[in-house]
Amino acid sequence: MGTGKKEKQRRIREGTTKDGNIRVKGENFYRDSKRVQFLNMYKSGKAIKNKHGDVIRAADYQDTTIPDARVQPDRRWFGNTRVISQDALQHFRDALGETQKDTYQVLLRRNKLPMSLLDEKDSTESPRARILETESFDQTFGPKAQRKKPRVAASSLEELVQATEEENKTYEEKEELKATLGLMGKQEDEENGWTQVTKEAIFSKGQSKRIWNELYKVIDSSDVVIHVLDARDPLGTRCKSVEEYMKKETPHKHLIYVLNKCDLVPTWVAAAWVKHLSKDRPTLAFHASITNSFGKGSLIQLLRQFSQLHTDRKQISVGFIGYPNTGKSSIINTLRKKKVCQVAPIPGETKVWQYITLMKRIFLIDCPGIVPPSTKDSEEDILFRGVVRVEHVSHPEQYIPGVLKRCQTKHLERTYEISGWKDATDFIEMLARKQGRLLKGGEPDESGVSKQILNDFNRGKIPWFVIPPEKEEDKKRKLDEEEVKSAKMQKVKD
């Protein structure tokens, strides 16, 4: 006898002729139980009332009857909890504060610590307005009050409207001036003490919203951020505003310096800058070249150390940020030992960020060059840092005196094989006549020769560098000692 017949007889004996499956009301050939429950969800949520308006069945979460609640009996209620005394917390906070300032130490497993308790907040400055210090309650309210009405500069409503319109007009003019980068001419405000000088639009390169969005994407996606600096002027190509942003918003990300273009400066200059910058962050000297590089092994070893610190992750991402034309893409090509990023000796070659695989656990991210806006930087400083393409600059001959200040005379004589110039104009004219770059009437092509000099200056054909602070102090100290010695010798002769 089959199993199905036995089961049928058992149901008849027990009086249950159903097949055992629980069916939902409304289920049929067209709607299955899941669809019916989904449709009933729309109908639910309302209370059911009788004809008198009394609630027969309350809606969900509407019932006023409170069920009996009991605390779950558990042995853990009577065991030790994770507590810490204030002395131990303060001791740990002091130790953590000392190590957080040291950029050569890494905090592992940050999520295991109560960072909200450990981070000390500056309680000296209160965010509230200090109104009571300037004007007390007694001077405003009570029998000794000196104020009878609010302090408004206007005596009537018409004057208030007029003053508001004037302030709004002044604000709109100021914002329009900012948007055009001062192209409307020199503007001065003696009361506020600001002066807006005419500035070429080309000198705003690297400050657009699109490029800053690319930078933020690179910072958010990176575990390690490499700040690429130009070895000739590391402090000039250093983005301090980005460092402050990372220190405040992303303190868990690692930031290191890479001093690129070390082949353009003497060895003692590169060593002095590495020593100076190592006080703030880990610093490496680097020369980007696919065939003959320097510092490649040290950088790869450092990245491997960072990957070993984050063993809980499958891979880490390394982002490259910095000024335009500092060699970010060239460093990536050097690490990969082949051309994976487009490079050029002109700024602005990298337009968007891109991912490159270095090895199984390390990825590299290339970023467009950024220029933090600064009121201290002049057009000459921006041009000499390689931010702007020289062919787009108008009147390039006005920047040649700055080149003569930064470069030694012997280097210029050796590069261009000329000597005996008196000023920048004389230097341009001598070089133009030597190269045969003359216009109609035998006049020198000052604009073309000036662009050539600026390109040679930015691309490393003319040797120049900024002296490190320690070496500059030593130089001043030696000069002072020599002056003291010469003064003593004069006294002895007298």
UniProtKB/Swiss-Prot annotation:
<dbReference type="GO" id="GO:0005525">
    <property type="term" value="F:GTP binding"/>
</dbReference>
<comment type="function">
    <text>GTPase that associates with pre-60S ribosomal subunits in the nucleolus and is required for their nuclear export and maturation.</text>
</comment>
<dbReference type="GO" id="GO:0005730">
    <property type="term" value="C:nucleolus"/>
</dbReference>
<dbReference type="Pfam" id="PF08153">
    <property type="entry name" value="NGP1NT"/>
</dbReference>
<dbReference type="InterPro" id="IPR050755">
    <property type="entry name" value="TRAFAC_YlqF/YawG_RiboMat"/>
</dbReference>
<protein>
    <recommendedName>
        <fullName>Nucleolar GTP-binding protein 2</fullName>
    </recommendedName>
</protein>
<keyword id="KW-0690">Ribosome biogenesis</keyword>
<dbReference type="InterPro" id="IPR030378">
    <property type="entry name" value="G_CP_dom"/>
</dbReference>
<dbReference type="Pfam" id="PF01926">
    <property type="entry name" value="MMR_HSR1"/>
</dbReference>
<dbReference type="GO" id="GO:0000055">
    <property type="term" value="P:ribosomal large subunit export from nucleus"/>
</dbReference>
<dbReference type="GO" id="GO:2000200">
    <property type="term" value="P:regulation of ribosomal subunit export from nucleus"/>
</dbReference>
<keyword id="KW-0539">Nucleus</keyword>
<dbReference type="GO" id="GO:0070180">
    <property type="term" value="F:large ribosomal subunit rRNA binding"/>
</dbReference>
<feature type="region of interest" description="Disordered">
    <location>
        <begin position="1"/>
        <end position="20"/>
    </location>
</feature>
<dbReference type="InterPro" id="IPR023179">
    <property type="entry name" value="GTP-bd_ortho_bundle_sf"/>
</dbReference>
<feature type="region of interest" description="Disordered">
    <location>
        <begin position="473"/>
        <end position="494"/>
    </location>
</feature>
<dbReference type="InterPro" id="IPR024929">
    <property type="entry name" value="GNL2_CP_dom"/>
</dbReference>
<dbReference type="GO" id="GO:0030687">
    <property type="term" value="C:preribosome, large subunit precursor"/>
</dbReference>
<feature type="binding site">
    <location>
        <begin position="322"/>
        <end position="329"/>
    </location>
    <ligand>
        <name>GTP</name>
    </ligand>
</feature>
<dbReference type="InterPro" id="IPR027417">
    <property type="entry name" value="P-loop_NTPase"/>
</dbReference>
<feature type="domain" description="CP-type G">
    <location>
        <begin position="212"/>
        <end position="373"/>
    </location>
</feature>
<keyword id="KW-0342">GTP-binding</keyword>
<comment type="similarity">
    <text>Belongs to the TRAFAC class YlqF/YawG GTPase family. NOG2 subfamily.</text>
</comment>
<keyword id="KW-0547">Nucleotide-binding</keyword>
<dbReference type="GO" id="GO:0005654">
    <property type="term" value="C:nucleoplasm"/>
</dbReference>
<feature type="binding site">
    <location>
        <begin position="366"/>
        <end position="370"/>
    </location>
    <ligand>
        <name>GTP</name>
    </ligand>
</feature>
<dbReference type="InterPro" id="IPR006073">
    <property type="entry name" value="GTP-bd"/>
</dbReference>
<dbReference type="InterPro" id="IPR012971">
    <property type="entry name" value="NOG2_N_dom"/>
</dbReference>
